[in-house]
A protein has these predicted regions:
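Short, mixed-charge, low-aromatic patches
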Residues: 19-25, 46-51, 80-86, 137-144, ...
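Catalytic domains of cell-wall/extracellular-matrix polysaccharide-remodeling enzymes
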Residues: 63, 94, 110-197, 201-224, ...
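Active-site beta->alpha N-cap acidic-glycine motif
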Residues: 29-113, 119, 123-130, 139
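Terminal accessory/targeting
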Residues: 1-51, 66-77, 192-242
Length: 242
C-alpha cells in the first residue's frame, strides 16, 4: 500500500513539474528582433565617429574638408542627399577621393514617417541613381532626413539593404549656437563608441570654426576617429526602437 502511495505521489509531482515548466519552454521560441537604428556602440575603446550631413549648399564642405585634412582626420562619414550630389558633383567626388565613408541622406528632405512606402522606395531609388551615376557606389548606411523614422520606416529601409544610423551626441551646429558652445557640448558629452552629428550644409555656418577645437579636445581625452562602418563592425551596437 505504501509502495502504491509513493508511486502516485511521484506521478503527481512529475505532472505538476511538467505543467509548471512547459510554459517556460514555450516562451523560448524565437521572436524576430524588431528593426532599430544605431546611435552608438557599446565599447570601452576610446573611438568615436564624426558624421556630417549635407543636403544643400557649396560653401561649407570645402572648409570642413580642409580642417579634416589639416588635422589628419582620414576617417569620417558623410551622409549626402541625392539632389546635392547631382548639383555638386565635384565636391562629392572630392569627398570620395579623400577616402571618407559616404552614406545616403535620402533625396527630398521630408520626414519619412509621414510618407508612404512607395514614396520612400521611390526617393531612395532616386538617391541610389545619383550615387551610382556620380560616385559609382551604392551606400549601405542611411541617415533619414531630420533623423525621422518609425518602425515601419526602419523595417522598409532594412528590407532595402540599409542600416539606419542616428547619433548619440548632437553638436547642434544646425542651430549655430556659437563655436565655444559647440566645442564644449561635443567634448563633454562624447563617450566611447559615440556617433557625433554635425553638418556640412551651408546653413551650419559655425561648424568649420568649431571643428578644429572639437578634434583637439577629443584627442586630448584620448579619442581616436573611425568611420561609422568601422565603429559598428564586430561590436555590439546600442540601438533604440522608435
Amino acid at each position: 500500500m505504501l509502495k502504491k502511495s509513493l508511486i502516485w505521489m511521484f506521478t503527481a509531482l512529475f505532472l505538476l513539474m511538467f505543467q509548471t515548466f512547459t510554459p517556460a519552454f514555450a516562451s523560448t521560441k524565437h521572436v524576430p528582433q524588431a528593426p532599430s537604428a544605431i546611435y552608438k556602440v557599446d565599447t570601452t575603446k576610446k573611438v568615436v565617429a564624426l558624421t556630417f550631413d549635407i543636403s544643400w549648399g557649396e560653401k561649407m564642405p570645402g572648409p570642413i574638408l580642409n580642417v579634416l585634412n589639416t588635422k589628419n582626420i582620414h576617417k569620417a562619414t558623410f551622409f549626402l542627399s541625392g539632389p546635392w550630389i547631382m548639383h555638386h558633383q565635384e565636391i562629392a567626388k572630392q569627398i570620395k577621393s579623400m577616402g571618407y565613408e559616404i552614406g545616403s541622406h535620402g533625396y527630398m528632405h521630408k520626414d519619412f514617417s509621414e510618407q508612404t512606402d512607395n514614396w520612400i522606395r521611390e526617393q531612395m531609388g532616386k538617391a541610389e541613381h545619383s550615387f551610382k551615376e556620380v560616385l559609382n557606389l551604392k551606400p549601405t548606411l542611411v541617415r533619414t532626413p531630420n533623423g525621422d523614422f518609425d518602425q515601419r520606416v526602419l523595417r522598409l529601409l532594412n528590407q532595402m539593404g540599409y542600416t539606419v544610423i542616428q547619433w548619440n551626441t548632437d553638436s547642434l551646429d544646425w542651430k549655430n549656437p556659437g563655436v565655444e558652445y559647440m566645442v564644449s557640448r561635443v567634448t563633454t558629452r562624447a563617450v566611447p563608441g559615440d556617433i557625433i552629428l554635425m553638418h556640412a550644409s551651408d546653413s551650419a555656418k559655425q561648424t568649420a570654426a568649431a571643428l578644429p577645437q572639437i578634434i583637439d579636445g577629443l584627442r586630448a581625452k584620448g579619442y581616436q576617429f573611425v568611420t561609422v562602418s568601422e565603429l559598428i563592425s564586430g561590436v555590439e551596437s546600442h540601438t533604440r526602437v522608435q
